[in-house]
Amino acid sequence: MFYQDPFDVIIIGGGHAGTEAAMAAARMGQQTLLLTHNIDTLGQMSCNPAIGGIGKGHLVKEVDALGGLMAKAIDQAGIQFRILNASKGPAVRATRAQADRVLYRQAVRTALENQPNLMIFQQAVEDLIVENDRVVGAVTQMGLKFRAKAVVLTVGTFLDGKIHIGLDNYSGGRAGDPPSIPLSRRLRELPLRVSRLKTGTPPRIDARTIDFSVLAQQHGDNPMPVFSFMGSADQHPRQVPCYITHTNEKTHDVIRNNLDRSPMYAGVIEGIGPRYCPSIEDKVMRFADRNQHQIFLEPEGLTSNEIYPNGISTSLPFDVQMQIVRSMQGMENARIVRPGYAIEYDFFDPRDLKPTLESKFIQGLFFAGQINGTTGYEEAAAQGLLAGLNAARFSAEKEGWAPRRDQAYLGVLVDDLCTLGTKEPYRMFTSRAEYRLMLREDNADLRLTEQGRELGLVDDERWARYNEKLESIERERQRLKSTWVNPQAESANEVNAHLTAPLSREASGEDLLRRPEMTYEQLVQLSPFTPGLEDRQAAEQVEIQVKYEGYIARQQDEIEKQQRNENTLLPATLDYRQVTGLSNEVIAKLNDHKPSSIGQASRISGITPAAISILLVWLKKQGMLRRSA
C-alpha cells in the first residue's frame, strides 16, 4: 500500500549524514520524510565519542555556517573541548570535542523532532521505486510505499554489513543493529559501480576497572572553545579529562603471535580499511620499529562507565583483545564491556555522482556519507547537508549547487570524490586543500553563510548575528586604520614597550598589528587603541585579516587564475573520441569520468596539461567553448 501523503524528499538512514540531509531539506521548505530502522539511534555515534579534529573541525564549522546541526549538537554534548595546532598558523588550527554519546543523541533528536516540514518514521527500507531511470519513492520492510520527488541514501555501514571478531563473522549494520541486505541487493541491480570497504572500532572498557592514578591526564582548553558560530561555552556540560596510556612490547608480542587469527591477515576480510585510522594490528606490523603507541582513554559520557580506548581498533578474537587491553599500564585488571570488531559494507563509486551528489544514472537519487567511500562523522554530515539541500532543490525544480574547492573543505571533499573516486575510506585533512589559508575554521561563516541564506538554509537569527559580526569587523578595521601613533607622542613610550624595535615613524593601529610581536589583545589595551571589540569571533577576524593580508591577497590571485579553468564547462554528452589529438588513455578516462569543467578534467589522474590544451583548442574550433557566469 502507498502512504496517503506524497513527500518532496525522502532520507533513508538517520546517522550523521541522514540527520543533516533531513534538516537541510526541511529548512528549505520541502516536505521531508526521514526513514530510520530505529528512532532511538538517530545521531548515534557508532565509533569514537568525539567531533572535530584536523580538517574535520573545518567541515563542522562549514556545516554550521550553512545552518546545519552538528556544531550546535556538540556544543550541548561536549565534555572536553580543545584547539589542536593552537601554536601553528590559523589555517591548520582545528577544534575537537569529546562527546557524551547520550547528550549528543538527545540534542540531535530534539532538533529533528522540532523541525517544521520534517516527519520521522521508523521502518527499514528494502526497495526503491524507480521509473524511467528516475527514483520516485521507497518501500519499507512491511511493504509500505512512500512517494517522493527525490531520495537521499545515507545508509552508513548497513548495506550488506558483515561484522568480524576473529575468524567468526555475522551479518550486522553495526553492533546491535541488523544489516540492510534487501536494499543492498536492490541497489546492485542499478547501473552503479559497487565495491566493499571495511572499518573497525576498539573494545569498550569499564572505567571502574582502570587504575587512572598511574596515568597521565589530558584536560581541555580554558577558556573553552565553542563549535557553533551561534554557540556559547555556557551551553557546554560538565568538563572531564581524558587519560593516556601506551602499548608496549608485551602488547605487540600478543598481536604478532595471533595474526593468524586476524580476519584481515587471514584473508577473510576483502574490504580495504581506513589508512589514517588503522587497526592496532596494522600499526604494529606497519611500524615495526616502534616499541609503543599512544592510546587515549576517552570517557563515553557523564553518566556512563564506558571508556573508549582510542588507538586500539581491532578485529582480533575476544580472548586476544583481553590480553591486549590488560598488557597496558593502568589496565592490568580492566574488563571489556563491548568487544572491538571490524565491519565490511558496500560502497558505491562516487565518480558516478554529480558534484551535487545526485546519481548520474538515476535522476533524483542522491548519495551521502559512508556509502560514498568516506569515513568519519564530520565528512558524513557535510555530504548529508549538501545532498539534502540539492534533493530539496531538485524537488523544487531548481538548479543544484556545490561549493568550489576554493570556497570550502566541503568543495574539496566532493570534488576529490567525484573526480578521483576512492579505493579506501576517505578522510579529510587540511593538506588536501590547495587554498587552505582561505579555508580556515574561523572564517567558515564569512565564506558560506551568505550563500546559505540565498539557498534558504540560514534562519533570521543566524543571518542577523552574521551581519552584526561583519559590521563589527569593518568598523574595527576602519578604526585601527585611522588611529595613529607618532614616535614623539607621549603614548609612543607605552606602545614601544610592546615592540622589539621602537617606532621610527608614525604608525596606524593596523601597522602595529601587522608586527609579529603584537597581538590584538595587547593592542587594544594600549591607550590610543582602547577599547577593543567584545565579540571574540570578530576580534579574531580582525587580527587574522590584518596579519595575513599579503598572503591572503596572493592566494586570492591564484584562485582567480584557476577559476578560468573551473568556469570553462564541458558538455555532459561530449564523446571524447571526437577530439582529435587525444591519446586513447585520455579519451577513455574522460569518457569514464565525464568531468563537468576543464578544472575538474585537469585533476583526473593521467590527464596531462597537453591534453587539456588540445581539448581547449578543439572546443574553441567547434564553437563549444562555454564559461559559467
Curated annotation (Swiss-Prot):
Q: Which GO terms describe its molecular function?
A: flavin adenine dinucleotide binding
Cell location? Cytoplasm
Annotated binding of NAD(+), by residue: 273-287
Main localization, broad class: cytoplasm
Residues binding FAD are 13-18, 125, 180, 370
Q: Which UniProt keywords apply?
A: Cytoplasm, FAD, Flavoprotein, NAD, tRNA processing
Q: What family is this?
A: Belongs to the MnmG family.
Which PANTHER family did the record assign?
Answer: GLUCOSE INHIBITED DIVISION PROTEIN A (PTHR11806), PROTEIN MTO1 HOMOLOG, MITOCHONDRIAL (PTHR11806:SF0)
According to the entry, what is the taxonomic lineage of the organism?
Answer: Bacteria, Pseudomonadati, Pseudomonadota, Gammaproteobacteria, Enterobacterales
Q: What organism is this sequence from?
A: Klebsiella pneumoniae subsp. pneumoniae (strain ATCC 700721 / MGH 78578)
Q: Which PROSITE patterns does the annotation name? A: GIDA_1, GIDA_2
Function summary: NAD-binding protein involved in the addition of a carboxymethylaminomethyl (cmnm) group at the wobble position (U34) of certain tRNAs, forming tRNA-cmnm(5)s(2)U34.
Relate the assembly described in the record: Homodimer. Heterotetramer of two MnmE and two MnmG subunits.
Which SUPFAM superfamilies does the UniProt record give? FAD/NAD(P)-binding domain
What name has this protein been given in UniProt? tRNA uridine 5-carboxymethylaminomethyl modification enzyme MnmG
InterPro entries per UniProt: FAD/NAD-bd_sf (IPR036188), GIDA_C_N (IPR049312), MnmG (IPR004416), MnmG-rel (IPR002218), MnmG-rel_CS (IPR020595), MnmG_C (IPR026904), MnmG_C_subdom (IPR047001), MnmG_C_subdom_sf (IPR044920)
Q: Which Pfam families does this chain map to?
A: GIDA, GIDA_C_1st, SAM_GIDA_C
Enumerate the cofactors the protein uses: FAD
Q: Which gene encodes it?
A: mnmG
User: What Gene Ontology terms describe where this protein resides (cellular component)?
Assistant: cytosol
GO biological process entries: tRNA methylation; tRNA wobble uridine modification
